[in-house]
Amino acid sequence: MFKKVLIVMAGLSVATMAHADNPTIRGTVASKCSVYTTTQGVFGNPSPNTLSTAPADGGVQPIVRYDVAIGNYYYGRITYPTSFTSSPNLTSSALEWTGDVDVSQVSVPGMSVYTTNAITYDNTVQYDLTLAGSTWFKISSEATYGYNQAFPAGSYVASVVAECIAK
């Protein structure tokens, strides 16, 4: 009888050892690069066919701040607008956009090379964020409507895209 109990217990022990489980491993990654709008842009209307963020034209340039906790892991990519996200109906498709992105303020003097090392393509400027700290970028945008055509009265909205891209 004792032998039978041992054999049954040994069989149960083997069955228990053969059991498998699939534990999960979870983690959350918090970005070490953040983007904040510090100044909303405003279009000035210096002439009937021009909308501009230039202060000389009555506009306000939008400013975004990048906060980087650990340098050399991110790119700052800023795209100025080439269309309106909201506007009155425009009867002509002859709408020309220009724009630019510039470093306006830095928290670390070494960040001054960001402008020199920037890569520009289409309407996007990419910066290699090599140092920890904060950098402010000002964006200029200008839309010119048709040949001697006035913008219709109404509200015009265009969007800047500012993002942190992991290297």
Question: How would you name each of these model-derived features?
Answer:
Residues 19-94, 127-167:
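N-terminal small/polar-rich segments of proteins
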Residues 4-7, 123, 144:
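Generic preference for well-ordered secondary structure
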Residues 18, 100, 117-118, 122, ...:
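Serine/threonine-rich, low-complexity intrinsically disordered segments
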Residues 5-9, 34, 119:
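Residue-level detector of intrinsically disordered/flexible regions characterized by low predicted structural confidence
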Residues 92-107:
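Short, surface-exposed beta-strand/strand-loop-strand elements in extracellular ectodomains
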Residues 1-20:
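Gram-negative bacterial Sec-dependent N-terminal signal peptides
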Residues 2-3, 88, 116, 122:
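Generic cytosolic/nucleocytoplasmic N-terminal low-complexity/intrinsically disordered segments
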Residues 107-131:
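Extended, solvent-exposed segments with strong compositional bias
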